[in-house]
């Protein structure tokens, strides 16, 4: 790998570019220039309402990251005390790490090749009396088979918490991701289609979970009135964290959300053009089933084997075209192997895909 390439400007084609326009600058400037309410401003609740409406969910809570959103959701549902949570190993590591944050145990399950999401037909073999929830992940903007997973969760009385960090705007059978599961989390990190630099959100149809999440993200405090405009002492119902999104971040989220469908359409058009150009080669393109709407947060291909994948990866890097391996199996990370005695070979499809995938 060419270590001399270190900055995003050094790449002919970087990993991602952020779309921004004057509307972003204008609303952020408006928040800055008012000289107050950079925290707990009206933009936060407005963004929450807009996201909930966009995905057709009853409630939304914004936070400072997708990882905080996962952590807060587990806390809100009372997951902990060595409960078991079914998760993919083919994911970003916070999908599993956040389970450990609440003293629960991540149980790694294999994925299906068509969506790179959890294989619903394999979930039953991982259930025990301690299983509390299933946490599927939507890979790169492609929905997993969430409807089948939901059916399984309901049959087995398990919570369904969707790690949709990469999938805001995607849908399956006409249903927006964020409206199907008990709760869904989104990330607004820099490489997402809708980005605020950092940020996250949770959608749910449960009012009680919504109320718990608001306490968890802000010190366990009841904010019937803006904390910084209330001369009286606040009421604290529980312990909580400082996971709030700032007003400036929320303002950027509002303007980015207005452009989201346009950005998705551009990505889908670009993906189609790339597919037309590379389909003659010996590779597989990750597009998902016909009933799903892939937003192409990432464009990923599968090569024949690890050797070919690695050679292409290094070739692209030398040509200053950024490519990356999303993802290496979490269960083969040294920390998880040491802690849970996870081994090579236990998740054959995950391990196969991880050796072939290139983004």
Kindly label every feature range from the protein language model.
Residues 61, 86, 107, 160-161, ...:
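Structural detector of well-ordered beta-strand residues that form the stable sheet scaffold
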Residues 75-164, 171:
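PLP-dependent aminotransferase-like
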Residues 186-187, 200-205, 254:
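Short beta-strand-to-turn element immediately C-terminal to the catalytic PLP-Schiff-base lysine
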